[in-house]
Amino acid sequence: MLAQFLRSLFRFRKTTVSVLLVATYVVVFLLNVWDRIRYQYSLPEDNKHHKQLLDASWIDLQSITRKPHPYTSRENDAVHDFLLHRVTELVEGAPHAEVSDDYKEGNHLVFKQPDVFNSSSTESRIVSFESSNIVVKITGSQPELPGLLISAHFDSVPTALGATDDGVGIVTLLALITRYAKKQPRRTLVFNLNNNEEFGLLGASAFLNHRWRPLVDYVLNLEGTGAGGKAVLFRTSDTNTASIYKNAVKTQPFGNSIYQQAFYDRYISSETDYKVYEQAGLRGWDIAFYKPRALYHTIKDSTQFTSQASLWNMMHASLQLADFIAFESFEDEPKDRSPAVYFDIIGTFFVTASTKDLFTLNCVVLSVIPVIILVLEFVIQRRKTRERNPLLVWLRLPFSMFISYLVTATFRSSLFRVNPLIFSRDYVSPTIGFSFTFLILNYLVLSLLEYLAPSRDLKTVSFVELFFGMWIALLWATIRLCTSKYTATGVYPITVLYLLMSFGAIVGLVCSAFKRKHSVVKAKDSEETAAPNTYSSIEESPQQATNTEAPNENSPEEHDERAPLLRASNSSQVSSVTNVSEAPSSALKAFVVSALNYDWSVQFLAVVPLASFFVIMCLSLILDGIYQTCQEGFQATWNVSKISMLGGMLLAIPVLPFCYKLNYFVSMVLLFAAASAGIFSFERAPFTESSPLKLRFSQELNLHDELGFSTVNVFGRQGAGIEQILRNIPSTQNAHSNVECTSNGQGSETCRYAGPRPHLVSSSSIPELSDILSIKVLSNNRKSSGRSSYEPINAELVINVKENRLCTIGFNSSQFAEHDYGQSPVKQVTIFGNAHHDNRTRSQLSTLDGLSRDDEENRIFKWNRGINSLQLHKLDFERNYYHVGIQWMPTILSQDADEESSDALGLKIRCFWGEYDSVSIINGEVKRKVPALDELLAYSPKEVSFSNREAGLVIVNDYIEL
């Protein structure tokens, strides 16, 4: 009985392969689901201290997310004051703690801000910024040790409440301050609760100007680029910092260096404060929420759509990491500062390695394993254990994969034409459709070829072919590692898959090389037809596949996978094999010969589960992060669909050597799953309330527009029905306003209509636009007879603007356009501390690039390579002006000057307002500040969400010429 059971269990037959495949997919699926939801069941119920921290943090989160609070709003000041009160309260009585408030201390900086999204950009943007960061210092008992900066930002965008971005990070900082105010750490910790991250990462830049900046060498940045879920280790500086995270975060570590490479390669277009700190020389960790993108920066970024489980997930990881750095000793060798490869395994294990070590490993396995394969092939050829005329067998898998790829690619192209935005709602269905379509087509082609010409070599030949395919992929990945200076931290899955395919190929070749030569088995049982004995595992012909009964006890027992692993003691069977050498006489040799026939089970169990798990783990992480970027344009949609298709095919590839052994039932299940996934992908609506269409709003007014139109701009994905949405709101229906949509040529469009005017400021009467914004030129010596034609031109102006915190000035001339061509003639800007013209400043101009101050503490910034734009921020709503000076060079000094060139300088002035969830009092009546946005939120379908397009919701424009 045992012999018959083992014979049936380990036989290379359709039922066994099918059961193992189904079991593999079920286990991998359950592990993936558990990894996704596990954090929801990990609240600190048994730890009183942690529970108190969590409860207090949740109350704090609710307090700071009552309203949107961008830097440009008064609510931003309310959040600042609340946080200042909280940290002062938390550190009270702690002699090793100190609080600094940039608002009171007047941290005003003027600096040239590099383009954090494009390191090769030559654009020169000068920023004048008044900071209101709250900085807390916890002095360590060993302050000589390198300190740790922990940072998060408390501003939100104008359209969001800022719960995940970045309220959770802020209240996590409050929890950490609570802990270390009571328990002094060894290292000094500095907490930067910074303001105005959303529009320029300016709060982080302001910290670099703070007196406590020299105390820290490490940084932990907490961010939210999604809305809830789990917080991931986006990136870390190097192998040392990755190892610190590994040693610190023992409970539910979560991170993957695939995301890190996406930042390196600029596939992720947004940035976090971590970039500023990294450029300043700090090393550390960037931990952030990363999905779903469609709720990010919308009104649904609120406590209603996140949870205490998400809060605890970020808080617990931060506590573990901060505790380790604060209290433990660790090595930080300079030699281990190459970029790191890292990933977690279902939140239980964390693996990290140097990319240089990965490069070395790749070089070794690229060289050694092919030699092993070739040696085994040579042995097989010498021993003649391979069947004759193998060329057609070697062509089967490439032919099958080619046909399957063509059909799968056609499926993807059709989906891209019919329902391209389905990925924004659900990437799982298309990916399953791609994967199972590819698998079932390979099954059909390979099964047909096997039926027409049975082969005993197909499985191992397939592994060898897949090995060489992965060899090419690994060669590319290794070259990529080298050429990227080891920043390609996301290529490690190729190494893993290469090693797995290599193992499968080597096992098959070893078993083939040391088996007996080709022979024919003669079975007395009429139910067993003659079959070759054995190269690799004996593979049934289609006629044999239907016969699953065990052979008669009196029939000969073959030395193949149908034999039991251990012989029965009373066995009296004899071999009836022809054309073979004498059977092994010893029981050990007989066992080895018999065991060699079970190579298929070793191959399957080692390759398919591990490869499937690894592919699903990496693919789900990638698609989780990018699937809703398909709303950003044609190219983004194409990229998401391509990754989904290639990932689905990669999931099927480890099964290909075995797929022709799937039975009818499983093949029909796969076919049904592929068809169902395809139908869902084609027919379902791409947007739902939980996965909405994300549109971006702005409203613009031009100061000298005689008609006084207030233009509402709605930006979004072309083909998503934006025009129809806008035609169904009261403003366009009642006033018969025309909706005009223009494409940007890349899959996005901007639709415009005349909307209700905003009410930006309170007034006793209906204010004119010129009452809100006006430009006054105080001086301009361009046409002065006292100025030499070779002398720089100087001008001063005041921008009078009410209840405002942000204006920008873009420069252009006859030879220069702000973002298009030429070098700006503007070489110097001055930020005056008052609104009054003062000629004394002109004689004190700096001759060096950079920032200087005059006797009146006016800030002067000089940049001889040209200044493209000036960004002006201020904190005081009651100071209704910006006073600036501008110096530019006459065209006569330009090599590109011509007769039509003019010395005139054009100024495009834009001022931004970011409040909408508040009111103004106009002529005694209560008016909502931005009724156009209120209208869109009220009357748009529930499947639509809105975010801001610009730094403010309302922009007032003016243009003057100096």
Swiss-Prot record:
Task: Tell me which cofactor or cofactors this protein depends on.
Answer: Zn(2+)
Annotated membrane-spanning segments are 15-35, 360-380, 391-411, 432-452, 461-481, 490-510, 602-622, 640-660, 662-682
- At which residues is glycosylation annotated? 118, 639, 812, 839
The site (Transition state stabilizer) lies at 296
Protein's membrane topology: Multi-pass membrane protein
Gene Ontology cellular-component terms listed:
vacuolar membrane
Q: Which residues face the membrane's Vacuolar side?
A: 36-359, 412-431, 482-489, 623-639, 683-962
Active site at 197
Location(s), subcellular: Vacuole membrane
- The UniProt record lists the EC number as 3.4.-.-
GO terms under biological process:
proteolysis
**Residue sites binding Zn(2+) 2 per the record:** 165, 198, 297
Say which family it is in: Belongs to the peptidase M28 family.
Q: What is this protein called?
A: Vacuolar membrane protease
Q: Which organism is it from?
A: Lachancea thermotolerans (strain ATCC 56472 / CBS 6340 / NRRL Y-8284) (Yeast)
Its taxonomic placement starts with:
Eukaryota, Fungi, Dikarya, Ascomycota, Saccharomycotina
